[in-house]
């Protein structure tokens, strides 16, 4: 399945109707969230369920240790827990029935499939709370609803074609309204065989169509996302060979037989952050000026009960700046996705097999739990001008800001999608056994180095740490170790490619000492 996003030609009437329908979808979703919260609270307070959950945990420990009887008992307890949840109404079918009652009130605007999609989204959150690492299901603001989607192309939103209308042959029909589609250039040949991407996509069967809205500083703009059956038309000609990829929170290194890549992910995201921070300071100052009664003397916000439910007031300038901030966040997100796509396209054009070490960026984004002191003493001056050596606490912050700005996990998601589309090979090694950042193929040993050490000496050559890790991944023998024979054969050529790449980067003024080492 692949998607085609097409802009819609809207007017004030259709935009007003779309806004009303998004409000109804938000109401259905949040009412379902309220219902889910109520059921989860009842489940948590139930002594019977808590007893079953405790028993299940004890049996799971025994079953994991190899106790066959405990495994059978665990399955029986799991069935009891499922039956108890079903009796409360904590199931996908029960949520669909609950949503159907609300949808009937708004059937002129929202059909049953569109309401069921919202029920499925809430149920996905409930499943995370019940079976995953989720803590609670949350309400969503009206501005957070970006799409209204159905399940098929037989009801709800239709993407249609009228061959008799030469000016606007394509349009979207939703209930009683018809919205023309702004078609892109269909004459331009953007495929290797001389075809057009849009026209080739339109030849596929349509699975369903959804309405999407994106925020610009001038307001909402609406698009039709058409989902087609089958793979997307292929714009690229995949290369041959093996490429190793070593990705970090803010950089990516890739090495194949004839290409070396060392790039910063989304390098201009800092510019967006500066603009956003500057506007947010202005918004904060304006908010404090127009709402002085809602702040304490120390600058903190008062509790809602202290200002008696009075609404917040914002100046027109403040509202305009808030709109700009929302647009900057959207542009920043689209920029990072675009840059990741460019890097992945370069990789696909060069290789057909991609080897990488899996990274848990969610864990890297979290703060450290343990409180530790630095190994190196710091000399400080006291008020009486005497000096004292102290061991300061280590910072608990890790890579949360980089992960948020650079979206490193999205790069691998795009690469996996491209591999599925072009039928390429994508493989993840065992990171606990492979340890590409520690291995030295000349001595066949593992030496752990500090994160700040970006270069190391291998076989008398100075190699960049990330590029060398990518090289070792490209020389994979099996999931736990690289092939030393292949490493010895390709290492001299790798050193030449690395030195040439670093020289070109320095000549072009590309430098990040903390990440690249230069």
Q: For each of these PLM feature ranges, what is it?
A:
Residues 1-111, 291, 295, 299-303, ...:
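Long, compositionally biased intrinsically disordered regions
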Residues 42-50, 135-144, 484-495:
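Short alpha-helical "patches" and their helix-cap loops
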Residues 56-217, 395, 400-401, 405, ...:
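Acidic carboxylate diad motif detector
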Residues 15, 19-22, 108, 112-120, ...:
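Generic detection of long, well-ordered alpha-helical segments
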Residues 29-36, 40, 126, 130-133, ...:
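A generic secondary-structure signal for well-formed alpha-helical elements
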Residues 16, 186-201, 207, 250, ...:
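Short, surface-exposed linear segments at secondary-structure transitions and domain or protein termini
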Residues 3, 220-518:
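Positively charged, helix-rich recognition surfaces that bind polyanionic ligands
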Residues 32, 117-125, 129, 467-477:
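Stable alpha-helical structural segments in soluble proteins, enriched in small hydrophobic residues
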């Amino acid at each position: 399945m692949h998607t085609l996003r097409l802009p819609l030609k809207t007017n004030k009437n259709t935009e007003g109707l779309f806004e009303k329908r998004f409000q109804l979808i938000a109401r259905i979703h949040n009412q379902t969230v309220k219902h889910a919260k109520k059921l989860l609270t009842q489940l948590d307070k139930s002594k019977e369920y808590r007893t079953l959950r405790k028993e299940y945990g004890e049996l799971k420990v025994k079953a994991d240790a190899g106790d066959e009887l405990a495994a059978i008992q665990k399955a029986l307890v799991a069935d009891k827990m499922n039956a108890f949840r079903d009796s409360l109404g904590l199931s996908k079918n029960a949520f669909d029935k609950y949503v159907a009652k609300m949808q009937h009130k708004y059937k002129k605007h929202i059909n049953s499939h569109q309401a069921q999609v919202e029920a499925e989204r809430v149920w996905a959150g409930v499943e995370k709370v019940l079976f995953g690492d989720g803590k609670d299901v949350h309400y969503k603001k009206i501005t957070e609803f970006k799409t209204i989607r159905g399940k098929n192309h037989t009801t709800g939103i239709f993407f249609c074609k009228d061959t008799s209308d030469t000016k606007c042959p394509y349009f979207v029909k939703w209930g009683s309204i018809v919205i023309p589609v702004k078609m892109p250039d269909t004459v331009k040949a953007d495929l290797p065989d001389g075809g057009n991407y849009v026209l080739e996509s339109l030849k596929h069967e349509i699975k369903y169509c959804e309405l999407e809205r994106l925020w610009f500083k001038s307001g909402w703009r609406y698009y039709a996302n058409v989902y087609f059956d089958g793979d997307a038309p292929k714009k690229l000609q995949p290369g041959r060979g093996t490429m190793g990829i070593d990705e970090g929170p803010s950089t990516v290194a890739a090495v194949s037989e004839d290409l070396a890549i060392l790039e910063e992910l989304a390098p201009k995201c800092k510019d967006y952050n500066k603009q956003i921070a500057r506007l947010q300071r202005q918004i904060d100052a304006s908010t404090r000026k127009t709402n002085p009664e809602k702040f304490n003397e120390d600058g903190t916000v008062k509790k809602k009960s202290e200002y008696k439910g009075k609404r917040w007031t914002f100046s027109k300038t403040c509202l305009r700046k808030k709109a700009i901030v929302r647009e900057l966040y959207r542009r920043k997100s689209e920029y990072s996705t675009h840059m990741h796509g460019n890097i992945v396209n370069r990789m696909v054009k060069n290789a057909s097999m991609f080897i990488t070490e899996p990274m848990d960026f969610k864990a890297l984004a979290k703060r450290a739990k343990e409180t530790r002191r630095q190994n190196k003493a710091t000399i400080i001056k006291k008020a009486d001008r005497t000096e004292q050596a102290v061991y300061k606490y280590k910072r608990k912050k890790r890579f949360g800001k980089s992960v948020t700005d650079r979206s490193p996990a999205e790069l691998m998601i795009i690469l996996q999608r491209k591999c599925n589309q072009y039928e390429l090979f994508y493989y993840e090694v065992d990171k606990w056994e492979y340890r590409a950042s520690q291995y030295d193929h000349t001595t066949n040993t593992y030496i752990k180095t500090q994160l700040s050490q970006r270069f190391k000496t291998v076989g008398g050559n100075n190699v960049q740490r990330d590029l060398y890790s990518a090289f070792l991944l490209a020389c994979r023998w099996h999931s736990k170790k690289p092939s030393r024979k292949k490493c010895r054969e390709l290492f001299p050529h790798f050193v030449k490619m690395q030195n040439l790449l670093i020289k070109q980067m320095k000549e072009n003024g590309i430098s990040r000492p903390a990440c690249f080492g230069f």
